[in-house]
Curated annotation (Swiss-Prot):
This is Homoserine kinase. Pathway: Amino-acid biosynthesis; L-threonine biosynthesis; L-threonine from L-aspartate: step 4/5. SUPFAM superfamilies: Protein kinase-like (PK-like). GO terms for molecular function: ATP binding; homoserine kinase activity. Keywords: Amino-acid biosynthesis, ATP-binding, Kinase, Nucleotide-binding, Threonine biosynthesis, Transferase. The gene is thrB.
Length: 305
């Protein structure tokens, strides 16, 4: 999360007039993350997370917010959206789309245990199953067409080796995207900083704003690539096993899915290597922003062999 759009106290008071959340107390920017402007909002009725969307359009928000409400009602640990007085889940602040969600207890972790990986994997499988009857649709905006287009933009600024690696991996994935595998609504960004933990248990998944339709192996691979990734950008096999074991305890994988998993891991590496390269070479101006190391997923990709 980051802060690109600054919000004054007076703007917040006007914004809150559309909600039954009491009086404004304070607003604190959240520096982590890279896409939207995020704040902790405190009112006389409690604490919430405010998100001002820098890229998503107003008409796209209902998918993400209704998905969170749907999952919350199905017992998945998520940050439920807060409705306005008029019943809408989305709003406008500083001329941009915005929303409020519940502020969950717990915190993220940079060094997960096997127990935390197991329970996070189980909750991811529960999420996949719970979203099976969700009626709204969203295609993946950051999949093959996106990374192919981004590659063309990035090649002039990359080293010769990185450019060759990126081209080769994207070419290899063209006819191997796993579209034949079980699919549904996926989180598509379930990194460690998007899961709140209370001890060994999951208190909530957050930041669903890349959620879309996709194959479940791709979603699982994205999560494992981060949760089991070590400081030197290799995979800890014990953490990987724990995460997948938790997932399979809720939703067993087919032999075909297991066979595809290594390819899904490579696709996950490409997706986040490309997005971080774009953020690094073409940064978005902001008051309090956080750009992540683009080489982490290149190095993980290389370690996969």
């Amino acid at each position: 999360m980051s802060v690109y759009t600054s919000v004054s106290d007076d703007e917040m008071r006007g914004f809150l007039s559309g909600y039954d959340l009491g009086e404004f107390v304070s607003l604190q920017g959240i520096a982590q993350g890279i896409t939207n402007s995020n704040y902790f909002l405190t009112t006389t009725s409690g604490r919430y997370v405010l998100t001002v969307f820098e890229v998503l359009k107003q008409e796209e928000l209902p998918f993400f917010l209704e998905l969170n409400r749907h999952l919350s009602m199905k017992g998945v640990a998520v940050a439920a959206p807060v409705a306005r007085k008029d019943g809408r889940l989305d709003s406008v602040l500083a001329g941009k789309p915005a929303c409020l969600v519940a502020c969950l207890k717990g915190s993220d972790t940079a060094l997960p245990t096997a127990e935390q990986c197991f329970h996070t994997g189980a909750m991811l499988a529960k999420m996949h199953l719970a979203a099976a009857d969700f009626p709204l649709e969203m295609e993946n905006p950051r999949y093959d067409a996106w990374w192919t287009e981004a590659c063309a933009r990035l090649l002039p600024v990359l080293s010769q080796d990185d450019a060759a690696l990126l081209r080769a991996e994207i070419d290899a994935l063209k006819d191997n995207l796993g579209n034949h595998l079980p699919s549904g609504i996926i989180h598509a960004d379930l990194f460690k900083d998007n899961v709140l933990l209370d001890g060994g248990q999951v208190s909530g998944f957050i930041d669903f704003y890349y959620a879309c339709r996709g194959n479940f192996m791709y979603d699982l691979a994205i999560a494992v690539n981060d949760w089991a990734r070590t400081a030197d950008n290799k995979l800890d096999e014990a953490l990987k096993k724990a995460f997948i074991g938790g997932y399979e305890g809720v939703r067993p994988l087919s032999a075909e899915e297991k066979a595809y998993f290594p390819t899904a891991q490579r696709a996950g590496c490409i997706r986040f290597w490309v997005s971080r390269l774009l953020d690094f070479h073409f940064p978005q101006a902001g008051e309090m922003t956080f750009i992540k190391d683009p080489n982490a997923f290149r190095n993980l990709l290389l370690s996969l062999g």
